[in-house]
Amino acid sequence: MYLAAKNKFQQEQSAKENAGLSRYVPEVLAKLGDPQTAIPRIAKDAQSIRLIERAVHQVPTSHSLYRGDSRDMSGLEPQSVHLVLTSPPYWTLKEYRDSEGQLGHVEDYDQFLQELDKVWKQCFQALVPGGRLICVVGDVCLSRRENGGRHTVVPLHSSIQEHCRKLGFDNLAPIIWHKISNAAYEVEGGSTFLGKPYEPNAVIKNDIEFILMERKPGGYRAPDISTKVLSVISAENHKKWFQQIWSGVTGASTRQHPAPYPLELAERLVRMFSFVGDTVLDPFMGTGTTTVSAAKWGRNSIGFEIDPHYYKLAQKRISEETSSLFSTAVIHSARVD
């Protein structure tokens, strides 16, 4: 009940903010003429892009942080979320804290996928038609020591794609993120897993992650001109971001969380697949990267985190980063039993 009330409040606030977005459009861009020609012109003009980015940082946003299990997000209103952006727990590999309900500790792979399905099903229901579930995930490498003397890769990314397809999502082409990661987290034993240097038959190092694109079937949205202008991506960034292989975005520090993803990556994805004023859901909030990105770029957000330690870290981080960078974000925190 508390979650439903909070979510309803957030959606009412979001609707009010969307209705007033025109006041944040820079005056010099307020009279654009034909949007079909004006938007590309703005995207190629560096000064216009700077004006828009400064304006977006002033858009009021609302963020609900819930300490609870995302396998039960029943309080979310159907079709109330425009984008789901998350990085789910890694099956058995990452060093998660010992908290009740932690999916990363489920030992059976098929059961792990079934538990994830409970989350994806509710994401599907919460998404608007045409909305996307974007899932940042890497495959799981098992060393010889932990897998009966056999090197094995468990294809977590393809398992999630197949399960999401069966739940009703449309699979779209993923982005391949080439990242520099900490090999100690990829496999126990370090170099012994990768094989002997300079000799044949070594094992290829696992240094990519997949950014999966799962789309809920439905039409394409037609936001008003103010929303379009405030959501414009520069021509330079559009060319760099909308390609299938990403490099140059380094992995985030694992000091506070075993499987973080960098703020730059989250900011890109928030801007690529949502509009200013939209609501972004992260069912595995961790330390709050998705929420910080949403707040910075004029989106509302909802986050769930089951681990009380990470939840507190997320609260602290989001409070600090939103207050230091901009003062238009309103944060709501609650526990869901």
Label the predicted regions.
Residues 68-72, 331-336:
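Conserved SAM/SAH-binding loop
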Residues 2-34, 54-313:
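Core catalytic lobe of class I
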